[in-house]
Amino acid sequence: MGSHRRYLYYSILSFLLLSCSVVLAKQDKTPFFEGTSSKNSRLTAQDKGNDTCPPCFNCMLPIFECKQFSECNSYTGRCECIEGFAGDDCSLPLCGGLSPDESGNKDRPIRAQNDTCHCDNGWGGINCDVCQEDFVCDAFMPDPSIKGTCYKNGMIVDKVFSGCNVTNEKILQILNGKIPQITFACDKPNQECNFQFWIDQLESFYCGLSDCAFEYDLEQNTSHYKCNDVQCKCVPDTVLCGAKGSIDISDFLTETIKGPGDFSCDLETRQCKFSEPSMNDLILTVFGDPYITLKCESGECVHYSEIPGYKSPSKDPTVSWQGKLVLALTAVMVLALFTFATFYISKSPLFRNGLGSSKSPIRLPDEDAVNNFLQNEDDTLATLSFENITYSVPSINSDGVEETVLNEISGIVKPGQILAIMGGSGAGKTTLLDILAMKRKTGHVSGSIKVNGISMDRKSFSKIIGFVDQDDFLLPTLTVFETVLNSALLRLPKALSFEAKKARVYKVLEELRIIDIKDRIIGNEFDRGISGGEKRRVSIACELVTSPLVLFLDEPTSGLDASNANNVIECLVRLSSDYNRTLVLSIHQPRSNIFYLFDKLVLLSKGEMVYSGNAKKVSEFLRNEGYICPDNYNIADYLIDITFEAGPQGKRRRIRNISDLEAGTDTNDIDNTIHQTTFTSSDGTTQREWAHLAAHRDEIRSLLRDEEDVEGTDGRRGATEIDLNTKLLHDKYKDSVYYAELSQEIEEVLSEGDEESNVLNGDLPTGQQSAGFLQQLSILNSRSFKNMYRNPKLLLGNYLLTILLSLFLGTLYYNVSNDISGFQNRMGLFFFILTYFGFVTFTGLSSFALERIIFIKERSNNYYSPLAYYISKIMSEVVPLRVVPPILLSLIVYPMTGLNMKDNAFFKCIGILILFNLGISLEILTIGIIFEDLNNSIILSVLVLLGSLLFSGLFINTKNITNVAFKYLKNFSVFYYAYESLLINEVKTLMLKERKYGLNIEVPGATILSTFGFVVQNLVFDIKILALFNVVFLIMGYLALKWIVVEQK
């Protein structure tokens, strides 16, 4: 064995001496990364006499092998080369760099023969696999937003590449200028390394090291890579391995080098050594050195958190003084804004001291001032005439067939007169009143409506009229005085002073005898307020306060007792007669004394005009046609009775007398009628019978509707017949002189030459300016805020719930950690917050449902523009309920949970929550505006929110959705953009650590976000999209309010 070693030593020594004799250059120390201009060529032995085509490369064949100890793929017969080499047998060095180029191409160029590598910017080494700059490592990071680090300290993290210059002086002297170098790469997870020995950048031999352990001596600042198994091979026909004029150590490398191998470095000086027992013996014998000494440079692309010795900053369990200052300033700012808003609102007319206060004296206006106000300066009056008003609607049972509701109704009413529209239930009174007031109708309207003989458009007509609905739609939290004042401030000319408007309010309240309840709230079914009759008078007061030229009232006495009904009608009569106003009202069953206060009458039955003209002449007309109202019988009741129709067949029945019904007599055997010209009984009996008839009218009608027409058995001639044929009465009126008088009166009004009609004394005041837009907005805001603080349940409940929920969440997620479980907690926290704010917005549906009918009524009566109401609702309801809660929640949750306070993350979080809360509330409000039914709007809102939640990014990774039908649905989810932006704002800059398998694994928060399908760079983009959602739904809500929420009867 000793002789064998001596032989090897002598052989190597002879080779080194021979090499020294042919070297022309002198020894020179060359840095490892310095380029060389050597043009040495590899010597290749070719058998020129062999003309046979060589077999294709197949590493499975014994004549071929994979260099660098690369693995052979048994399926393809190709070598799977280690990093830095290519070619069929992995013998060709690669250049360029480890990272892909700008186009993403990872194919590295092969080094040209007899040339050196030209490395890409940021890479170095013989094979261009040692990083030099940090930026080249960005390509190896899991997300483009994460920056990589070129770690050059030499301690392996995952896979390190090193390049070394041999520094043994005797070896350098013997090579006489040729540069010996080593490339060394280790793979820590696989516990293996590879080693290449180069002379003038031409590979001579290589080694593979396995079963490696990687140790560090932190005290000495050294690293030790120990590999138990080492195997080496020569590259044929190279220096030291059979090149011409050189010795061949192939057998020595293959048979003698077995390991263990040790690669140790001083990490401060970068001085390294490579030792292996057999190789050490050779070096010691020949050169006198115990091992190969090296000067190395290494590089490994890692994330900064993976650098050995790196310690992630510990999470401060308490809020810093800067954070406390931010929280305090934010709280002060919110309080200041609230104070300013309160002060601004208190300056509104509805909030002035003394208005409507029970302690303030009531100063009624002077009579002259009121008269001057009620009477127009130009003495403009309005005569309303209408001809052949016909209204039809599509029939439910017949396709394409229209059902006539009103048929050719005509009439006229002049200033100072009251026109009453009467008839039984279903006669068409309210329909005719709506048409005369030019309300929007769903059916087809024909005929003409003129004021002073001139046709007017709906917009101009609405400015000179007032309309009192049959039902009372009033804000329940306002007082009587505030309700009427609200109408006055919004609708009276803005040129009038506030004192003049207030004086008019007091006067109207006095006229309607509700001045004593002026400080009582309206109330509703939950909060007791004024009575139903008082509400009716308040509704009338809201219209009377504007002193319209034409006032329409639908059942003004409905719900009032006899005394109050008489007071209301007398007030209307005074308004009509004293101030020459034109009044049109529908009324069902007035008292007789009220009936005789009417100037004009339109009597309807089943949509047909039975009479139209002077109210006092209706008895004369009926008497002429054989219908005589009994003495002491209410003429209004009598008119309803005679227009009552028995049924679709026009059936009639006969009644002998009222006492028969009272006594229970079988009316099928009686022949009598209500209307008779002579009476067989005494006057007292007759009076009692008619009194009984008035009290039991509905019972008699029921009998008339259900019984068959039966002829009496006694055949007495004293009884007369109840003629219920509406068509007959209609035809009789059309043929009467009264209809002719009506037609002539209408013609006179239409005639421009009629100077005595006194109805064309001035132009109609359609251009009168009421409150401007800003005035409307101020009044509506003050009204809404007053409504809010008098009924603070919704506002305070929202705030209280938000505070309690914030405390609960702060306690549950207290001091959330910076690890994977902390990331999960953050996801759950933000998702729950968004879900809470999302479903709380449902309160907007119920609040608008209560206001919808009030808005429709006030809009149709020209209180304000839809835009003023919409902006007022946003300012007075959406802002307090959707802006303040996110701020309160953030002020509590942020310090308790210890969320990220860096880079203004706190303010960004507040902004994101506010934008989301506003956006989702506007979306829900838009749905509530579009759908009139509250149940339908709630169902659709739930579906919208659930769909938005599904695509928020928590329940499904939106990047992995391949179905085209669902792939882009996240783009319509407000939750997705809010959720993504909140997570990015919180986690992007955090380093999350986790203890797994005994290792402290650190993962950038941005990496986890990318895993969940979120795009880390989208923070600003998401915020812009949230703002866009707000703008879109804000516009959609207004357009829906303007075009959908309109009065249509």
From Swiss-Prot:
Residues 26-324, 482-793, 850-877, 931-937, 1022-1024 are lumenal. Pfam families: ABC2_membrane, ABC2_membrane_7, ABC_tran. The modification Phosphoserine is found at residues 659, 702. Residues 1-25 form the signal peptide. Keywords: ATP-binding, Endoplasmic reticulum, Glycoprotein, Membrane, Nucleotide-binding, Phosphoprotein, Signal, Transmembrane, Transmembrane helix, Transport. Residues 346-463, 815-828, 899-909, 959-1000, 1046-1049 are cytoplasmic. GO terms for molecular function: ABC-type transporter activity; ATP binding; ATP hydrolysis activity; ATPase-coupled transmembrane transporter activity. It is found in: Endoplasmic reticulum membrane. Glycans are attached at residues 50, 114, 165, 221, 935. Its main location: endoplasmic reticulum. GO terms for biological process: transmembrane transport. GO terms for cellular component: cytoplasm; endoplasmic reticulum; endoplasmic reticulum membrane; fungal-type vacuole; fungal-type vacuole membrane; membrane. ATP binds at residues 423-430. It is a multi-pass membrane protein. Residues 793-1044 form the ABC transmembrane type-2 domain. Residues 384-631 form the ABC transporter domain. The chain crosses the membrane at residues 325-345, 464-481, 794-814, 829-849, 878-898, 910-930, 938-958, 1001-1021, 1025-1045. Present with 339 molecules/cell in log phase SD medium. Belongs to the ABC transporter superfamily. ABCG family. Eye pigment precursor importer (TC 3.A.1.204) subfamily. This is Probable ATP-dependent permease. It comes from Saccharomyces cerevisiae (strain ATCC 204508 / S288c).
